[in-house]
Amino acid sequence: MRCSLTSMRTIERTTAFKRDFKREAKGPHRAVLDTDLRQIITALANDQPLEPRHRDHALSSNWKGYRDCHVRPDLVLIYRIDEDRLMLARLGSHSELDL
């Protein structure tokens, strides 16, 4: 019997995302970061739609090909989805990410 998780995308994190995560884990979002971000990443990796409150949308200009969604109202995740991969690119506020 096959597990339904076999269709889950591989999750990759850029060096910038890892640095951003460490910074945010020490900041005001530390209490909810793990659970809120985990829910979003799980949904994206399994091709499930995000709740409207996350305001998921495509980016343009320097970030063409990427999307962003709000983990919290002032915390944004920038990511890219390929056929078999979810690339977590950046995590931070709009001002930190120059959005």
Name every feature range the model reports, one short phrase each.
Residues 1-73, 81-87, 95-99:
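Basic, Lys/Arg-enriched alpha-helical interface segments
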